[in-house]
Amino acid sequence: MADTYDLILKGGILVNHDGEGPLDLGIRAGRFAAIDDLSRASAGEVIDCKGLHLLPGVIDTQVHFREPGLTHKEDLESGSLSAVMGGVTAVFEMPNTDPLTVSAETLA
């Protein structure tokens, strides 16, 4: 019997620690359940990813959320949402604010 997933990302170029190549990604209950040729599997939804690269979550090691003091440029909400939309799952905040957020007292 074929496996069943909630979602299959089909035909993309998967990039991971082994390199890159055409593979499918099966997702079940919000988690990666299979990375393989899933042509015999079924899913509630299948997304054709041909011509797209599938990447693990990206870490952005230099962001400036500008909060406090410079939120007219960017704030935590807009910066975080932008990061998520770009596939970023973790950020390193660089304090470029007024006042500088470099101490526990300033962050309180």
Residue ranges of model-derived segments:
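Histidine-rich, glycine-flanked metal-binding segment
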Residues: 2-57
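Metal-associated gating/positioning segment near the N- to mid-region
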Residues: 52-108
